């Protein structure tokens, strides 16, 4: 048997099958296997019965083991033999099994240690060979580089985890705050409704008492009259059956008493009670209608907020393309604001530029997916915003309509809002638009507009057919007064907690200014 094989056998015999290290206080079990004392303690825990061998899984009714001192001594000898091996790369690696020479070289092609005879052999001729020590140092350097890289990645992962934990805590704190606000608001609403309920029920109690007090006297009087009439009827019936002599006695008085009885007037409910009940019923009807309107408005507002929030999930940052701007339009340095000037700039008449109407396009181009952005129109009196195809005519007259590749809404002279359909559609808005949200669903062929301030839907172009890339579209003119203020594209990063390009499930093409 080769010496290397003997060494391997000795190492296997002195290695714990659980921790795969040299035995430390080996304990022999009834099945004959040896396990480190500490390993047995970890495997068995506090169990005293029905324990099993970690190696062969044989079960023992009682916890029984005994120290194997002989194996412990052999283990110490094997460890000493390994520490007394010859030093140096050749001694550490051993000798070449083929040539019985020390392994002092390393073949880079075959990635294995070799001896000097192997280096001269045909098998390794022409291979890149390094001294073993140099190869080991190189590998150690590579390992160190990988260790440094992995440690950096680990540190980054830890920071990301900490950021995630912080974000989770902050978001959960926000949801808890919202939860507490909802509970508080509904408690206030509940108490308010309960107070109204108590007041209405108390008013009903007052009406009940008024009804009793007002009608009970009349009912008591009727009861007395009925009792008197019953007595008189009984007397007349008795008189009617008497013999002639008795019947004629006091007949005049008897008939006179009957004749004095008058037919009662028709019953009339006290009008003041009817009026009070009518007023109360009107209050209840008003309350019912108010609660119904409140419920419907709350449901409608929740749906509006949800619809707008879903659109805002597809937020993109839009900027103005100066190569397309009409010369009278002045763009800001950050390409997010545009205002009208009577003085035209001296700009090149490139093919992309509008040369007759005060229009400018935005970037990027959209070729698929869903995209949302917002525009601050403020108090401007004349403007048009929306989307258009990138291929629209830039020179000469242009009519903003779907058949020409435009899908937009417009304000005329600060009074009339229009959707530029064909023919145009009037938009009877309850409140003026200050901030407009534009939502493009390219694949569905829809362009929607929202009143961001009121959180409500304004208009949607449906069944649009886009022939190529689509771009944000802006047009404005000067009409004096407040309308001289710029039209502003709102930065979408951080809008109400949303980040730009969150959920932008689509494709866009950047256009370089």
UniProtKB/Swiss-Prot annotation:
E3 ubiquitin-protein ligase that mediates ubiquitination of various substrates and thereby plays a role in diffent processes including proliferation, innate immunity, apoptosis, immune response or autophagy. Ubiquitinates PIK3C2B and inhibits its activity by mediating the formation of 'Lys-48'-linked polyubiquitin chains; the function inhibits CD4 T-cell activation. Acts as a regulator of retrograde transport: together with MAGEL2, mediates the formation of 'Lys-63'-linked polyubiquitin chains at 'Lys-220' of WASHC1, leading to promote endosomal F-actin assembly. (Microbial infection) Positively regulates hepatitis C virus replication by suppressing type I IFN response during infection. GO terms for cellular component: cytoplasm; cytosol; early endosome; endosome; fibrillar center; mitochondrion; nuclear membrane; nucleolus. Zn(2+) binds at residues 96, 99, 118, 124. Residues 298-492 form the B30.2/SPRY domain. The gene is TRIM27. Its EC number is 2.3.2.27. Residues 132-172, 282-311 form a coiled coil. Transmembrane segments: none annotated. Pathway: Protein modification; protein ubiquitination. Changing residue 16 to A: Abolished E3 ubiquitin-protein ligase activity. This is Zinc finger protein RFP. Keywords: Chromosomal rearrangement, Coiled coil, Cytoplasm, DNA-binding, Endosome, Metal-binding, Mitochondrion, Nucleus, Proto-oncogene, Repressor, Transcription, Transcription regulation, Transferase, Transport, Ubl conjugation pathway, Zinc, Zinc-finger. GO terms for molecular function: DNA binding; identical protein binding; metal ion binding; nucleic acid binding; SUMO transferase activity; transcription coactivator activity; ubiquitin protein ligase activity; ubiquitin-protein transferase activity. A zinc finger (B box-type) spans 96-127. The lineage of its organism: Eukaryota, Metazoa, Chordata, Craniata, Vertebrata.
């Amino acid at each position: 048997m080769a010496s290397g094989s003997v060494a391997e056998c000795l190492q296997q015999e002195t290695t714990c099958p659980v921790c795969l290290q040299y035995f430390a206080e080996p304990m022999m079990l009834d099945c004959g296997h040896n396990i480190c004392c500490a390993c047995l303690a970890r495997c068995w825990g506090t169990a005293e019965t029905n324990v099993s061998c970690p190696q062969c899984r044989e079960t023992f009714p009682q916890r029984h083991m005994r120290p194997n001192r002989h194996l412990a001594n052999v283990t110490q000898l094997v460890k000493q033999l390994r520490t007394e091996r010859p030093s140096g790369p050749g001694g550490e690696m051993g000798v070449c099994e083929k040539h019985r020479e020390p392994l002092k070289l390393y073949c880079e092609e075959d990635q294995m240690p070799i001896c000097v005879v192997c280096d001269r052999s045909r098998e390794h001729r022409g291979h890149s060979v390094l001294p073993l020590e140099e190869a080991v140092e190189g590998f150690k350097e590579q390992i160190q580089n990988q260790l440094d890289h992995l440690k950096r990645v680990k540190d980054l992962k830890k920071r990301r985890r900490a950021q995630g934990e912080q974000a989770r805590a902050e978001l959960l704190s926000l949801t808890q705050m919202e939860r507490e606000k909802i509970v508080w608001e509904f408690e206030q609403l509940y108490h308010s409704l309960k107070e109204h309920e108590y007041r209405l029920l108390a008013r009903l109690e007052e009406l009940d008492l008024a009804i009793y007090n007002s009608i009970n006297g009349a009912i008591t009087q009727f009861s007395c009259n009925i009792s008197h009439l019953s007595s008189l009827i009984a007397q007349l019936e008795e008189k009617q059956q008497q013999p002639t002599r008795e019947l004629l006695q006091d007949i005049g008085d008897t008939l006179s008493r009957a004749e004095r009885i008058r037919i009662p007037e028709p019953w009339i409910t006290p009008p003041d009670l009817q009026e009070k009940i009518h007023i109360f019923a009107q209050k209840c009807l008003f309350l019912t209608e108010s609660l119904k309107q409140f419920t419907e408005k709350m449901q409608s507002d929740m749906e509006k907020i949800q619809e707008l929030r879903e659109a805002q999930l597809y937020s993109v940052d839009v900027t103005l393309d100066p190569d397309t701007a009409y010369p009278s339009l002045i763009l800001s340095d950050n390409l997010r604001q545009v205002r009208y000037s009577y003085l035209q700039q001296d700009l090149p008449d490139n093919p992309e530029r509008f040369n007759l109407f005060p229009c400018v396009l935005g970037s990027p181009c959209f070729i698929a997916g869903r995209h949302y952005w917002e525009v601050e129109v403020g108090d401007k009196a004349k403007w048009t915003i929306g989307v258009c195809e990138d291929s629209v005519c830039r020179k000469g007259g242009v009519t903003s309509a779907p058949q020409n590749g435009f899908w937009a809404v417009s304000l005329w002279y600060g009074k009339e809002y229009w959707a530029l359909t064909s023919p145009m559609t009037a938009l009877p808005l309850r409140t003026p638009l200050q901030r407009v949200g534009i939502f493009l669903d390219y694949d569905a062929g829809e362009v929607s507009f929202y009143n961001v301030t009121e959180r409500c839907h304004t208009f949607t172009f449906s069944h649009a057919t886009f022939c190529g890339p689509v771009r944000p579209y802006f047009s404005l003119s000067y009409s004096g007064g407040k309308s001289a203020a710029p039209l502003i594209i709102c930065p979408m990063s951080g809008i109400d907690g949303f980040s730009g390009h969150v959920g932008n499930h689509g494709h866009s093409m950047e256009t370089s200014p």
